[in-house]
Every structure is written in structure tokens, then in C-alpha cells.
Amino acid sequence: MLFAKILALAGLSAAATVETSSVKGKAFDRFVIIYFENQNYDKAFGDPNFTWLANKGITLTNYFAATHPSQPNYMASIAGDYFGLDGDGVVDSPAEVATVIDLLESKNISWAHYEEDMPYTGYTGSSYKNSRGRNDYVRKHNPAIMHKSVSDSTDRLSRVKNMSNIDTSRSSFHTDLENNALPQWMFITPNMTSDGHDSSVTTAGTWCRWFLEPLLTNSNFMQNTLVLVTWDESESYSIRNNILGILVGDAVPSQLVGTTDASFYSHYSEIATVSANWDLPTLGRWDVGANVYQMVANKTGDTIRTWDNATEFQSYYWNDAYGGYFNSNDNLPIPAPNLSLDSNTFNGRHILQSVKDTWANSDAPTYYTDSIKVSDSQHPPPGFSP
């Protein structure tokens, strides 16, 4: 019955676009992001399967999520901000908000989202349940679909694809893998059981090893590939939002396998690293000041910066949202990208031209800088208190 339902729904789906590219990067040629759910650093690192994975790459020990709950972290990971979002309900970011997708497309770098057990390519519903009535796919864990710049575009929707590990014959991920047609940038979201949200860190670790171990030796996947395995947020809201990050893949230099990196990173580092690797512009938001992963910075020449005040750093928890457009208590505008950060920054990168054009005459306030210091609810941007 469930399979018949999927077949019926498939008639409404967007046709999946298969597009490859071969834009050389300075440190990697393919970047894959995999998010797991709601786990404190120590508990994630203590799982034997995640420890196994960490021993095959670089452990990022000082990685921080943006806030709580889940959805704003997914939004931040591609948009360079979460705009005060403090819930998991359906949101649609206005079309003028650019994302990393715009950066990638500016240089014709292929991209896709692969969402486990999403019923079909381009699905925009809030969730999809399995035959037992449990959540498999949820929209709040799909960063692309919460942006109108994607959901209003048939072409972009065709790159938001399904992944099935039960029936690989209907899985866009497995089809693209078999055909050596995976894109250069990927965001992979396990389902609500696989990611640990409705299960446990043990289940998540088991799934991660089962899924990734064969891919680490698959030549259709490993093509100077860097994989980031991380979490959307920590489990405990009362402590600092420190999460585990692991970098693996054949792009990791052999001398760095099994090492740790204690540099300060955030979800915005995911965007900054992509910009540095492929000489892409920025979004003019929190991505401008974010640290690039050290192994990538070794190739790009980026400077890894530290907080200038250790006591101040310890006072940032990133465990609650500052105010903003999506905040349930506010009625504030989307802040403008800081257009003064166009090449006038420590890294010298320009802001994407379409972003400059869109926001050139905006009177919206802005609060972004090229500092690595990122606001939280206790240290909100001016005028954006929660």
C-alpha cells in the first residue's frame, strides 16, 4: 500500500535534474554535508561508530551550532543567517534571500539535496510518514526547500531529490551514484530514525557507518571529495551548543588523518569553506567572517582566526535565537547583507553581484561584520533582541 501511494505521488513530482560539473577546487572537488540530529559533543564522540569515522579523518572539536531548535540551523547552513527563527514550523524565506546555491551557480558548480525517504523529487510538504505512521522525511531538515528562491523554481526543485535505502531502484541518490552523475556539492539528510532524532546516537552511528563506509572506497563518490559529518544542534539547551564535526574523504591529506582541529567553526563555516575552495563570492552575511576549515585554509591561504577574549568567548552559548523576521515574538525586517563587506574584508572576497543588485537600494538594517564573533540571544545584534 505504501509503495502504491508513493507511485501515485510520483506523478506529481518534479523531474529530477541530473547535472554534473568538474570545476576544480583548491582543496577538494566535491563537498558533501551530512547532518545528524540533536546530540551533545561528548555523547556523539563516545559512540563507537562515530569514533571509527573520526579516526579516518579530522575531528573538529570546537564546532558550534547557531541556535535551537533544529530548523534555524539548517537555514543558517546555506543562507548565512537564521533571521531570528525560533521554531520548527513551516517557513518560506523571501526570494530576495540568497543562499550558497546562488554562489555555486555563479560558477556553474553542480549541486543537489538528497533527502532520505522524501517521497519524490521536489516535494514541498511538511512531512512524510512511513506505513507505521512515524515520521520519515520532515521539511524542517531540508535547508533548500525553506527558501522561496528554491521552492518557486522548477529547475532548482528538480535538484532537491529523494534517497531511499530500502528501495534503491527509486532512489535518485543511488541512481546518480551508479551513473557517476553525482554533483559537486551535496547536502544529505537521513530520515528521522537514521539521524538519531526519533531514535538514539547508537542508531545514528550505525546508519552513518553503514551508509558511508562503502562510499569511502567508491570511485564514483570519492573524487577528491571532502565529507562533513556533523549535527544540527546539541541535545541539551542549557549548555553551550557545541557539536561534533568530522571531515573525511580522499581530499583529506594523509598526514591529517586521525588528527583534531580545535579552531572555532560554526555552520557558517560550511559556506565560507565552499567560497574559499572554489573562489566564489560571499552572501554578505555571517559567512563573511566565518573561519574556513584549517585543512582547506592550508591550500587557499585563508587565515584562521581566534576570539581575542577567551572569557567573552565562554559567555556565548548559541542556545537561543536572537530577534528577527521569523521570530515568534517579533515583527522585524530581513536584515540586508552588509554591502560594505564587498572585498573590504580580511579575506578580500567580493559579495555576489546579484546580492548587491538586489539590496543596493534597501533601507533594511544590517548587522553583519567580517569578525568571527557571531551573535546569540545573550549578545544579539543591535535592534534584534529576542
Predicted regions and their residues:
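N-terminal pro-sequences and low-complexity stem/linker regions of secreted or lumenal proteins
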Residues: A16-P386
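Fungal secretory targeting signals
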Residues: M1-T17, V274
